Design a protein with these regions (language model features):
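Alpha-solenoid helical repeat scaffolds
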Residues: 1-182
Length: 182
């Protein structure tokens, strides 16, 4: 821990994971509040705070927690992706649909494409889901993932949302962090 009382980013992520694992959400928020600002924490802290707010059942604060991402160049698609995931998780179909569309307008992220396709399938809009998958099937870098989505689509099985628990939302943040660092 630094003399300022702030926690380094790696230590912070470890303490946060421990607090979340023990379902101590208030402690998790305290850890986030004490984390030193860095290139990594600039975007991870708002995302982790948002999903912790989801775990607390405060969806309004969850969406508000994502606001700092608007000030980081290039992170608007990620902010919209998480808004869509949160609204989808909450069951707010209209807002989720709009957020998915806005996120895809900004960036054709494979995670957003997959999440939106599943959303469309669950919403009974199978033709739209299929069109989404096939539209991006030939895009460089997306071929394998879209083929997998089409294969799953063709099975006709009921698809779950990408995020089924707030813990999965936090895991999505870690997945996004890994993708950003590579």
């Amino acid at each position: 821990m630094a003399r300022s009382g702030k926690i380094s980013s790696i230590t912070s992520l470890t303490l946060f994971a421990d607090a979340i694992g023990s379902k101590n959400l208030k402690k998790a928020i305290k850890v986030l509040n004490r984390t030193k600002v860095s290139a990594i924490t600039d975007f991870t802290i708002p995302l982790l705070r948002a999903w912790t707010m989801v775990a607390m059942g405060d969806y309004k604060k969850a969406i508000s927690a994502l606001e700092p991402l608007t000030r980081i160049q290039g992170f608007e698609p990620m902010r919209l992706h998480h808004i869509a995931l949160i609204e989808d998780f909450k069951g707010n179909k209209i807002v989720a649909d709009q957020a998915y569309i806005r996120a895809l307008d900004k960036s054709k992220s494979i995670r957003t494409l997959q999440a939106y396709g599943r959303f469309l399938e669950r919403s009974g809009r199978r033709a739209e889901a299929y069109n989404l998958y096939t539209k991006y099937q030939t895009r460089q870098g997306l071929e394998n993932q879209m083929k997998e989505e089409i294969f799953k689509f063709d099975t006709g099985l009921q698809r779950s949302g990408m995020i089924r628990t707030s813990s999965e939302g936090i895991a999505e943040v870690m997945f996004n962090l890994a993708g950003t660092l590579t």
